[in-house]
């Protein structure tokens, strides 16, 4: 399965549009992990623990997107958009959502 944020794939023709596909992943905030991340893990203004969790959530969302596309018979997803949003009481969770168009391609 190929993924692209662009509307086309270099060297390939889109022969069929299969539909819009989506994927989501929600990260819950853990107060103790958050506290220790703030003390131990911030180096140069970045938190490795948070970055690792965000990467994992993005991978889960993209995996869901790919599974939906495959179920539609697609071999690629184009025009992918990745969004991050806080949800829950007091923004206590982070949602990663991805969407795109499932397509069939030909070289």
From Swiss-Prot:
Entries under Pfam families matching the protein: YbjQ_1 (PF01906)
Domain of life: Bacteria
InterPro entries assigned: UPF0145_dom_sf, UPF0145_YbjQ-like
PANTHER family, per database record: UPF0145 PROTEIN YBJQ
Similarity-based family: Belongs to the UPF0145 family.
UniProt-recorded name of the protein: UPF0145 protein YbjQ
Species per Swiss-Prot/TrEMBL record: Salmonella dublin (strain CT_02021853)
């Amino acid at each position: 399965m190929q993924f692209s944020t662009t509307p086309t794939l270099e060297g390939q023709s889109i022969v069929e549009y299969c539909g819009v596909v989506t994927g989501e992943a929600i990260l819950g905030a853990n107060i103790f992990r958050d506290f220790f991340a703030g003390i131990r893990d911030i180096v140069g203004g970045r938190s490795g623990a948070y970055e690792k969790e965000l990467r994992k959530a993005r991978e889960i969302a993209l995996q869901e997107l790919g599974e939906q596309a495959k179920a539609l018979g697609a071999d690629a997803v184009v025009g992918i958009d990745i969004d991050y949003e806080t949800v829950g009481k007091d923004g206590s969770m982070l949602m990663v959502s991805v969407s795109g168009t499932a397509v069939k391609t030909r070289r």
